[in-house]
A protein has these predicted regions:
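Short functional hotspots at interaction and active-site rims
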Residues: 1-197
Length: 197
């Protein structure tokens, strides 16, 4: 399933030429950015029980804390992971770019992110370009072009498995989940998004 807007002529045109436009950039130089939500009520979505027995699991339905995970992914692995309470805004995103992302960048890296308004606040491009890296935005309605979406799937599956119930447990579980992302995983994420390796 995908967004119907991908078939609008203007969006379809941008999507059709995306991979061609990146052909000159080695995959090892591509750095994809995104954020995702996590909370203290995450639990496995399925499980097993002995034949004839019902699977029973407990999930909190009361107060829980929602947090935002932000990171980048490149062929070598996940980088610059941050976790903070609440939703992303432009000020937090710029702080992450300056303090988390930029120290991991090298000259000629190409940072790619979606068109979220918080990704376009003043100072983001300047911070990235200050180290000789470049910035591009994905075509609209194109999460399938972002390998980090597959990384989030793996990380959330790990978080559900660990089932953190406090902020401290969520922080520890997030660290564990990011450490579980291997270069082999990242290769698969890039291939799944149709990038030439």
């Amino acid at each position: 399933m995908h967004a119907a807007e991908q078939h609008r002529p203007d969006v379809a045109e941008q999507r059709a030429h995306w991979h061609e436009q990146l052909a000159a950039d080695p995959a090892a130089r591509l750095v994809f950015v995104d954020e995702s939500g996590a909370n203290t009520k995450m639990t496995r979505l399925g499980g097993r029980a002995p034949v004839g027995e019902r699977l029973v699991s407990q999930v909190p339905h009361g107060h829980y804390q929602t947090s935002t995970l932000i990171a980048a992914v490149r062929l070598a692995g996940a980088c610059a992971p941050w976790l903070f309470e609440g939703a992303m805004d432009g000020e937090l995103f710029l702080a992450w770019v300056r303090q988390g992302l930029v120290p991991t960048l090298q000259a000629d890296d190409l940072v790619i992110m979606d068109n979220l308004a918080t990704h376009k606040v003043a100072g983001v491009r300047e911070a990235i370009e200050s180290v000789g890296a470049r910035l591009r935005y994905l075509p609209p309605y194109s999460p399938d072009f972002n390998p980090i979406e597959n990384m989030w799937s793996k990380i959330k599956q790990r978080l559900r498995s660990l089932a953190p119930r406090t902020d401290e447990e969520l922080l520890e579980a997030a660290a564990d989940a990011f450490e579980s992302v291997s270069p082999a995983d990242c290769l698969g994420f890039f291939l799944h998004a149709n990038y030439d390796i």
